[in-house]
C-alpha cells in the first residue's frame, strides 16, 4: 500500500498558493485493508474513506469509463492493480495530475510542473471531453489563476468547443451549473469565468440571457465601451473591487439583462430596460435554481438601479417610494448591497472607473433619515391602526424633504 497527496494541494503548493484541503490517493490497497486500518467508508460510487484522525479523504486509485452522456455517465474500476499513473490520467488538467509521495517526491507523468511554470491550463488526455463539468471547472480555474498569468491552452479550448457543439453541456443539471458559477463568483476574476464560457460557446447554452448582451450597443456618450456585454463584465469587475460578497457580484453581472430584448430599431437607447429585465432575471434564476438571497438582490438591482443613478433628481415622494420598495427599513444590509451594485454599474464603464458616485451615500443617508421615524411616538399621541401608518409616511416624507433641501447640488 502506497499513499500519495494529489490534486489541488500539490498544485497550489508548487504555485505557492494557499490551500485548505488535502486529498489522498491510495495505491495497492483493498477496501478491506482500509477498513482494517480504521478508515471510515464514505464513497457511494467508488471507494473513498475518511482518515480516522484527520477526517481527510483517501480514495483508492481508480479508472473511469464513459458509459452515457453527461457528467454522471461513468463506470468506475478501483482495485489494488490500478496504478498511480492510471489514476492521474483520468484527471482533468495536467496541473491537477501531479502527486507527492510521503517523502515529498513529486510524481508528474503528464508534465503538470511544466504547465505550472508556463502558466498553462491544459487537459491531460482526450478523456477530458467525456465530462461536461470540466468546462465549468477549467473556466473557474482560469478565473482563479488569471492574476498569476494562467491561460487556457488553444487545443484545450478547442476541445471545450467540440464538447459544447456535441451537446454535452446540455446534460448539466442546474444545481451543478450554479455550484460552479457561485464558486467562480468568489474567485479574484469571475469575469474570466464568463468570458471563457463565451469563448467556448457554453454561455449561450447555460446563460443565454447574459450571452445575448454581447454585440448590443449602448449610447457611447454614457458607455464608452459601447457593447452591453462588455459593460456587464466591467460592472462585475468593479463589483469585485467593491465587495467580496458573491450576491453583489452576481447582481452586478446581470443587472442589464433587459437590454438584450430591446428592439433593434431602438438601439442604442434602452428605455424601460429595467422592468424588461426583471422577468429575464427571474427566468435565469429559476433555471439555475439560484438561492433566494441572490435572486432577490438581482431583481432589486435590475428594477431600481437607474433610480439610484438619478438619486438627486428624484422628488421626495419618489425617493421615499423607492426606499420602501427596496425594503430598506427591514433589510438595511441588502440595501447597502444594492447601493454597491449601483456603484459598480456606474463605475463599470471604460475610463469612468474612478468617477465619484455620491448617489450611493445619498440613498443610504435617506434611509438613515426615515429610520429615525418610530411608530411609538404616534401611539403615544393616541393614534391607532391606519392613522399610525399615515402619520409615519408623512413624517418620513418630511425627513426626505428636509434632506433634499439640505443637499449640496450635484452635477
Swiss-Prot record:
- What job does the chain carry out? Catalyzes the addition and repair of the essential 3'-terminal CCA sequence in tRNAs without using a nucleic acid template. Adds these three nucleotides in the order of C, C, and A to the tRNA nucleotide-73, using CTP and ATP as substrates and producing inorganic pyrophosphate. tRNA 3'-terminal CCA addition is required both for tRNA processing and repair. Also involved in tRNA surveillance by mediating tandem CCA addition to generate a CCACCA at the 3' terminus of unstable tRNAs. While stable tRNAs receive only 3'-terminal CCA, unstable tRNAs are marked with CCACCA and rapidly degraded.
Q: Name one GO biological process term.
A: tRNA 3'-terminal CCA addition
- Free-text cofactor note: Magnesium is required for nucleotidyltransferase activity.
Q: How does it assemble?
A: Monomer. Can also form homodimers and oligomers.
| The family this protein is said to belong to | Belongs to the tRNA nucleotidyltransferase/poly(A) polymerase family. Bacterial CCA-adding enzyme type 1 subfamily.
Name of the protein: Multifunctional CCA protein
> Which Pfam families does the record cross-reference, listed alphabetically?
HD, PolyA_pol, PolyA_pol_RNAbd
| Entry cofactors | Mg(2+); Ni(2+)
Which InterPro entries does this UniProt record tie to the protein?
A: CCA_bact, HD/PDEase_dom, HD_domain, NT_sf, PolA_pol_head_dom, PolyA_RNA-bd, tRNA_CCA-adding_enzyme
Q: Give the HD domain ranges.
A: 228-329
Positions that bind CTP: 8, 11, 91, 137, 140
Organism in which the protein naturally occurs: Teredinibacter turnerae (strain ATCC 39867 / T7901)
Q: Which gene encodes it?
A: cca
